[in-house]
Amino acid sequence: MFTLFLLIALSSAKVYFHETFENRDKWIDSTSSGKALGPFKIVSGKWYGDANNKGLQTSEDNKFYIAAAKLDEEFSNKDKNLIVQYNLKFEQGIDCGGGYIKLLPKKSIESEEKFTPESEYNIMFGPDVCGGSKRTHVIMNYKGKNNLIRKEIKCESDDISHLYTLIIRPNNTYVVKIDGVEKQEGKFDEDWDMLAPKEIDDPNVSKPADWVDEKEIDDPNDKKPEGWDDIPKTIVDPNAKKPEEWNDEDDGEWEAPTIENPEYKGEWKPKRIPNPAYKGEWVHPQIANPDYVYDPELYKYDSFAYIGIDVWQVKAGTIYDDILITDDIEEAEKEAKVILERNAAEKKMRDEIKEAEKQKEEEAKKEAEKQKEEETKEEIKKEENKEEL
């Protein structure tokens, strides 16, 4: 029976969207966002694993990039795996900008050009970098609310391509991979605040009035030293002298400046000691939440119809490529293997380019130093000739 079910599942496995960017015909820029959009370009990039492989690149700094494409067909992931996978390169050396994608239901927009940052989406997935923050977003919409994953998933921020994979299973579990390596996995009801909490504070219990939660107290045996408050904060500078040119009649009576008193110790405070009555931090007793109801279909969306890119980039140059949306894990893994091999070749080319640039810079530096040395010798020679004359 299981074998039959497996064969049926494999035979019905489908690819709903596969974009390798031979062109950008599927992608329509937003005309409804009200923002000044930067243009996308189809490029191979400065370094690549295959010169014939293209991607969709952001091309102008400090611009929004908002475009959408229609999936090959509308579908629901009910009772099926959902795999969202794509290759992304921050070729520009990202400092602040996103590289994520959004999956939208049919009801969200009438057509691709109607896509805006406010359009409702089912899932937002992918890297987002700004300053020290480098995270992979996995935002799930549930009953109209966008829920951020509670776990932190670091993203890659260098200038080579990385493959991002999100797997959602019909048992309410998920996996996030980067470059084929699992970075996070878990359960929907544990890693997102989609449902009401399973337990809540018992409303019939309050912290006892005599509960002591102060760890330390003032030492009752510590006394303020006599004369403590008599020490002034400032004193007359003993090294100050009235200027010889000072005239009391013209300048007024001279007053020596004051300085901070090295003997002054500030406000006296008694020493602190452990509180013998301390009971520890009071923990509110928990009870089962009567509003908690488990949803076995947290993973499920009735409609996937569009994919959108909606990012702001301070520094442009990000390249999207190899976007795959399918319910076939084997198909995604097969494609990932090819992409990762190509990414390895891309890294090799990038390293060779960087090494050549480094050598060129070093040679230019040596040439400049040599030139400066020759100029110095020439100056010395000129000075010597002047002295002889």
Curated annotation (Swiss-Prot):
Gene Ontology annotations for the cellular component aspect, listed alphabetically: cell surface; cytosol; endoplasmic reticulum; endoplasmic reticulum lumen; endoplasmic reticulum membrane; phagocytic cup; uropod
Induction summary: Up-regulated during the early stages (30 min-2 hours) of the development of amoebic liver abscess in the host followed by a rapid decrease to basal expression level.
Main location class: endoplasmic reticulum
Cellular localization per UniProt: Endoplasmic reticulum lumen; Cell projection, Uropodium; Cell surface; Cell projection, Phagocytic cup
Pfam families documented for this protein: Calreticulin
Signal peptide bounds: 1-13
Presence of the UniProt keyword GTP-binding in the record: no
Disulphide-bonded residues: 96-130
Residue interval(s) of motif Prevents secretion from ER: 386-389
Region annotation Disordered: where it falls in the sequence: 213-256, 347-389
Region 3 X approximate repeats, residue ranges: 252-290
Classification via InterPro entries: Calret/calnex (IPR001580), Calret/calnex_CS (IPR018124), Calreticulin (IPR009169), Calreticulin/calnexin_P_dom_sf (IPR009033), ConA-like_dom_sf (IPR013320)
Segments forming a coiled coil: 329-388
Keyword set, alphabetical order: Calcium, Cell projection, Chaperone, Coiled coil, Disulfide bond, Endoplasmic reticulum, Lectin, Metal-binding, Repeat, Signal, Zinc
Sequence repeat copies, ranges: 183-194, 202-213, 219-230, 237-248, 252-262, 266-276, 280-290
A GO BP annotation: ERAD pathway
GO MF annotation: an example: host cell surface binding
Compositional bias (Basic and acidic residues): 213-232
Chain residue ranges for the region called N-domain: 12-189
Swiss-Prot/TrEMBL domain comment: Can be divided into a N-terminal globular domain, a proline-rich P-domain forming an elongated arm-like structure and a C-terminal acidic domain. The P-domain binds one molecule of calcium with high affinity, whereas the acidic C-domain binds multiple calcium ions with low affinity.
PANTHER family, A to Z: CALRETICULIN (PTHR11073:SF2), CALRETICULIN AND CALNEXIN (PTHR11073)
Function description: Molecular calcium-binding chaperone promoting folding, oligomeric assembly and quality control in the ER via the calreticulin/calnexin cycle. This lectin may interact transiently with almost all of the monoglucosylated glycoproteins that are synthesized in the ER. Plays a role in host cell phagocytosis, possibly by acting as a receptor for host C1q. Binding to C1q prevents the activation of the host classical complement pathway. Also, binds to apoptotic host cells independently of host C1q and collectins.
UniProt similarity note: Belongs to the calreticulin family.
Subunit annotation: Interacts (via C-terminus) with host C1q.
Name under which the protein is recorded: Calreticulin
Native species: Entamoeba histolytica (strain ATCC 30459 / HM-1:IMSS / ABRM)
Gene (name only): CRT
